[in-house]
UniProtKB/Swiss-Prot annotation:
Species this chain originates from: Pseudomonas syringae pv. syringae (strain B728a)
Positions bearing the Tryptophyl-tyrosyl-methioninium (Trp-Tyr) (with M-270) cross-link: 91-244
Subunit note: Homodimer or homotetramer.
EC code: 1.11.1.21
Keywords: Heme, Hydrogen peroxide, Iron, Metal-binding, Oxidoreductase, Peroxidase
GO function terms (MF aspect): catalase activity; heme binding; metal ion binding
Gene: katG
Protein name: Catalase-peroxidase
Cofactor binding summary note: Binds 1 heme b (iron(II)-protoporphyrin IX) group per dimer.
């Protein structure tokens, strides 16, 4: 008898048609359950900061310096030095950051995983990471991939004669792809149709030659576009799979002026101003080259699509040797300077020293070469010492000359090389550290002493902190001040809920709720907020004036303490006595320490926890709630119990009654869940839309409650309903209060990295 199974076995666990296939618009809660101990091989007790502090950074840097010039046959170094490749690796790791939601960036080593490891803009960076694997292997748990990638970029710059601004460690690795980052809706690599909508396509310019005089372009909208392109938020790249812009020009059209618009938009969304943008491009392109030795159809599949035998590498190239002088990466074949492994100002000297005309790379990509054969023989070949070339430029390079604002900065850097060096050092540090959060997270001996405005500085605590007796006294004064539970809780929530786990910005520390721009945000109800802050500042002044020995309470601490007092009073109103944990130690930042423009990105377009939405968006209100919860590092159960508690504490913006499913607001009960799950009412959309709903008594038809999509999703979505049933049960009140206090405390302390 044959032992072969008669039943075909065609699929393994996890395969087949998924719920997402059946219901593509189903609310995605998986983004709330990423990076747990189930995916982390390091164990629950692993302390990366402790390990990093034991690292001999100078020894690591020496090992990296050795790697720089030890060219490997399997991937030869351009010009005998891997430095430019490593700069690109670090740049592309950090350059995914965007200000809109703080996601992306170098902070978790995501370049190792899909989709970033397979983006078209990251071709050959798989080799860069393999080149430094021996260093990672040697130091193991003491340095993360996230830190090593950035450090390697710094060492590359230093090894080629550039003085960097510094380096800080502290980026802990994650062990799976981030599922919360929205990279766009396009379904093809290098697509851009969704992020720009049905906007007019760029048209090819006429003669293919750029006129030399920049003033001819000063008042020109564009030679290729009739208006601004509107890039979808929060995206910061013009096409799917690019870090910033298309180096050939918008949609591949070689128009430097139009390219400047894309550069300004994308770099601006990564928190870079014009000077920082010029410095990054001019500084980065002082080194190395691009690669376009032959047609792109010679290049095989990306790492995620390559065969097992490729062992995580991709883009196998069948053109010539497939490496060295035959490398194909971007399809562009550009070398900017005659000293591509040495810091110099030659990039700008060449940019302004030649007049440029359009040509094509061997791969057929648009690039620029000096007119009339100028510069021939100036540039060395990356692999053949017998060959010489003329300098060349990208369309995005020429944007620095023919955009009026960029041109002014570029000429200043051309005439003042020391200004470029300083600006590039600072911009590079900002690029590679922008998503690390406050200085409390910076580790290592090379951390700069200078405090920078974009780091959202907070003063050090220079006074004695309040003790338990002081806390009790202050809470009593707060509760006797006439402020309601709703006012106390909503104010603390407004302060703490600005935190973003993505780039570690925001939170209650710093007391910036009292400063511009936060004090004026509509979501914070400025008129009510001003009154609450005035009362709390009075309590603060009275308390501090009565102390001896320098003891003080900051307004940042007092705002959180007031929220805690409100929660405790609400629990007491419900018959439960709880003490909400409180850890003093927050300090108050000044307006001068607060970059208003930078902080404006923290203003929520929606806060489902306060039933607030600034406008009408394509994204559903419930999806925006989950997005907010993910930024607050909440799980689905935490999100559920927190929202249910905040609803009955009546903190909705504008005192809206939507979702306040209780007859006793200000009392910490599980009424939200009990009444949402009540089968004695029937929910129907209100007239004119599907954003608000009414619950009518099934017998009388009377309206009992009103709610939003954010409220109703907790009864509609199967997973959220299952959690809601836990908190809506008859025996759940004690658990509900306990769990609410725990997650409330978590949110209040999200930015307290000093407590870790």
């Amino acid at each position: 008898m044959s032992t072969e199974s008669k039943c075909p076995f065609n699929h393994a666990a996890g395969g087949g048609t998924t719920n997402r296939d059946w219901w593509p618009k189903q609310l995605n809660l998986k983004i709330l359950h990423q990076h747990s101990t189930l995916s982390d091989p390091m164990g629950e007790n692993f302390d990366y900061a402790k390990e990093f502090k034991s690292l001999d950074i100078e020894a690591v840097k020496q090992d990296l310096r050795n790697v720089m010039t030890q060219s490997q046959d399997w991937w030869p170094a351009d010009f005998g030095h891997y430095g430019p490749l490593f700069i690109r690796m670090a740049w592309h790791s950090a350059g995914t950051y965007r200000t809109g939601d703080g996601r992306g960036g170098a902070g978790a080593g995501q370049q190792r995983f899909a989709p970033l490891n397979s983006w078209p803009d990251n071709v050959s960076l798989d080799k860069a990471r393999r080149l430094i694997w021996p260093v990672k292997q040697k130091y193991g748990r003491k340095i993360s991939w996230a830190d090593l990638i950035v450090l390697t970029g710094n060492v590359a710059l230093e090894s080629m004669g550039f003085k960097t601004f510094g380096f800080s460690g502290g980026r802990a690795d994650v062990w799976e792809p981030e599922e919360d980052v929205y990279w766009g809706s396009e379904t093809t690599w290098l697509g851009g149709e969704e992020r720009y909508g049905a906007q007019k396509k760029m048209q090819q310019p006429g003669d293919g030659t750029l006129v030399a005089e920049p003033e001819n372009h000063a008042n020109e909208e564009s030679r290729t576009a009739s208006g601004e392109r509107n890039l979808e938020n929060p995206l910061a790249a013009v096409q799917m799979g690019l870090i910033y812009v298309n180096p050939e020009g918008p949609e591949g059209v070689p128009d430097p002026v139009a390219s400047a618009r894309d550069i300004r938009e994308t770099f601006g969304r990564m928190a870079m101003n014009d000077e920082e943008t010029v410095a990054l491009i001019a500084g980065g392109h002082a080194f190395g080259k691009t690669h376009g030795a032959g047609p792109a159809d010679n290049v095989g599949p990306e790492p995620e699509a390559a065969g097992l035998e490729e062992q995580g590498l991709g883009w196998r190239n069948k053109f010539g040797s497939g490496k060295g002088g035959d490398t194909i990466t971007s399809g562009l074949e550009v070398t900017w300077t005659s000293t591509p492994t040495k810091w110099s100002n030659e990039y700008l000297e060449n940019l302004f020293g030649f007049e440029w005309e359009l040509t094509k790379s061997p791969a057929g990509a648009h690039q620029w070469t000096p007119k009339n054969g100028a510069g021939a023989g100036k540039i060395p070949d990356a692999h053949d010492p017998s060959k010489r070339h003329a300098p060349s430029m990208l369309t995005s390079d020429l944007a620095l000359r023919f955009d009026p604002a960029y041109e002014q900065i570029s000429r200043r850097f051309l005439n003042n090389p020391e200004q470029l060096a300083d600006a590039f050092a600072r911009a590079w540090f900002k690029l590679t550290h922008r998503d690390m959060g406050p200085l409390a997270r910076y580790l290592g001996p090379e951390t700069p002493a200078e405090e920078l405005l974009w780091q959202d500085p907070i003063p050090s605590v220079d006074h004695a902190l309040v003790d338990d007796q002081d806390v009790a006294t202050l809470k009593a004064k707060i509760l006797a001040s006439g402020l309601s539970v709703s006012q106390l809780v909503s104010t603390a929530w407004a302060a703490a809920s600005t935190f973003r786990g993505s780039d570690k910005r925001g939170g209650a520390n710093g007391g910036r709720l009292r400063l511009a721009p936060q004090k004026d945000w509509a979501v914070n109800q400025p008129e009510q907020l001003a009154g609450v802050l005035k009362t709390l500042e009075g309590i603060q002044s009275e308390f501090n004036a009565a102390q001896s020995g320098g003891k003080k309470v900051s307004i940042a601490d007092l705002i959180v303490l007031a929220g805690n007092a409100g929660v405790e009073q609400a629990a007491k109103n419900a018959g439960q006595h709880v003490t909400v944990p409180f850890a003093p130690g927050r300090a108050d930042a000044s307006q001068e320490q607060t970059d208003v423009e930078s902080f404006s990105f923290l203003e929520p377009i929606a806060d489902g926890f306060r039933n607030y939405q600034k406008g009408h968006y394509k994204v559903s209100a419930e999806s925006l709630l989950v997005d907010k919860a993910q930024l607050l590092t909440l799980t689905a159960p935490e999100m559920t119990v927190l929202l249910g508690g905040l609803r009955v504490l009546n903190i909705n913006v504008g005192q809206s009654k939507h979702g306040v499913f209780t007859d006793q607001p200000g009392t910490l009960t599980n009424d939200f869940f009990k009444n949402l799950l009540d089968m004695g009412v029937e929910w129907k959309a209100t007239a004119g839309g599907t954003d608000t709903f009414e619950a009518r008594d099934r017998k009388t038809g009377a309206v009992k409650w009103t709610g939003t999509r954010v409220d109703l999703v907790f009864g509609s979505h199967a997973q959220l309903r299952a959690i809601s049933e836990v908190y809506g049960s008859s025996d759940a009140h004690e658990k509900f209060v306990k769990d609410f206090v725990a997650v409330w405390t978590k949110v209040m302390n999200l930015d307290r990295f000093d407590l870790a």
